[in-house]
Amino acid sequence: MTRYEVVFIAIPTLGNLVPQVEFANLLTKHDPRFSATILTVSMPQRPLMNTYVQARASSAANIKLLQLPIVDPPAPEQYQTLVGFLSLHMQNHKHHVKHALLNLMKTTESNSSNSVRLAAIFVDMFSTTLIDVAAELAVPCYLFFASPASCLGFTLDLPRFDLAESKSEFTVPCFKNLLPRSVFPNLVLDAKDGTFWLSYHARRYKETKGIVINTLQELETHALQSLHNDSQLQRVYPIGPILDLVGSAQWDPNPAQYKRIMEWLDQQPLSSVVLLCFGSMGSLEANQVEEIAIGLERAGVRFLWALRESPKAQLEYPRDYENHKDVLPDGFLERTNNIGLVCGWVPQAVVLAHKAVGGFVSHCGWNSILESLWHGVPVATWPLYSEQQMNAFQMVRDLGLAVEISVDYRVGADLVRAEEVENGLRSLMKGGDEIRRKVKEMSDTCRGALLENGSSYSNLVSLIQELTS
């Protein structure tokens, strides 16, 4: 029997690495002929990444995680944005990726008991410089896109936008409605190197043999049809939702806090708690924290608030506060003691699955949106960075699957007032029956897509047929 090896590599962010690892897990479980090697890239500024990798390596079957040697980071004068840094950082790993692939090819060739073939390498959205290595070694290369299909379409269309125009709205084929300039990513609006790198990667996407997207046909029907109409693209495979449903519960950096959170949730009524969580890279300034606190207190809803301190350095993740009283209004914790819990890092996937949780104030990272839809928990949108403003716009305006607190918020430039927070929370937790119904329907649809003969299941079968042909 011929066996197949697939290789994956992603930038060192949880939002990109985790879904890629889960896709490798899905692929190898679906077809036991496949095994996977994940090439991981370390960043000393992000120890949480190493915690995840070590935990996943010990629990993964048929998946091997291989740490690439550490390389010198790009010099500060070489980049202006995080995407610029990450793109160059991945480019600097070319030699080590080539060495790893050559070793894998030698191993597969020397396997006398079974025929083993290196079937493909999957790069992520900011690792396209590694397509050169795949081409040099004649290894089929695919793109694994961890963001929505709408974001992929926007990125591919980016070169045709004239941002010097004074237009406030743009026609973007992957969106049903005109897309406001105000929800464009900061990378595009800032006069830095972000647009260059996004356009560079978009051009290279078209060199891959196919694009695997963490979405499903029934969720992003319009965007996926738009991509299908692009004759320059190879086949697109929507195979989601790909989720780590255990999440950080299996590698939580603070097990005592995890226990405290879950015990508190166990004591709350059904669907009564709103989770406020802004992702692994999300944090807010002190004046915004104060407005949220006032809005929460006025709304009177039960809440679990993952409140984290802004990073001290550019490439670091936020960290837990030593004392939340340092940033919250005087007496807030005491006044809300009976209805709320303020904490640091939360095991988001497990919390969203808890029966007490009935709403989610989210930064609208795509993984978080998919988790909320899977568990049937309605979202109130509060985007912070990356493509999250566009995700929020799509969820609220195009799909009608979310309540709006903001769709175009930007840290440091905007302030959502306590009244807006209060109104958004009330709408999410005490109204929004139509959105709640639609989210529950989409939850059932997400689960059905992964079952035999479901849309994502069928696309995975088609991908496997191509990989093994």
From Swiss-Prot:
The keyword Transferase applies. It is an enzyme of class 2 (transferase). Gene3D superfamilies: Glycogen Phosphorylase B. Its EC number is 2.4.1.-. UDP-alpha-D-glucose binds at residues 280, 345-346, 363-371, 385-388. Inhibited by Cu(2+) or Zn(2+). Coiled coil: none annotated. PANTHER family: GLYCOSYLTRANSFERASE. The lineage of its organism: Eukaryota, Viridiplantae, Streptophyta, Embryophyta, Tracheophyta. Optimum pH is 8.0. Glycosyltransferase that catalyzes the C-glucosylation of daidzein to puerarin. Shows activity with the isoflavones daidzein and genistein, but has no activity towards flavonoids such as 2-hydroxynaringenin. Can use UDP-glucose, but not UDP-galactose or UDP-glucuronic acid as sugar donor. Does not require bivalent cations for activity. Disulfide bonds: none annotated. GO terms for molecular function: UDP-glucosyltransferase activity. This is UDP-glycosyltransferase 43. Belongs to the UDP-glycosyltransferase family. Keywords: Glycosyltransferase, Transferase.
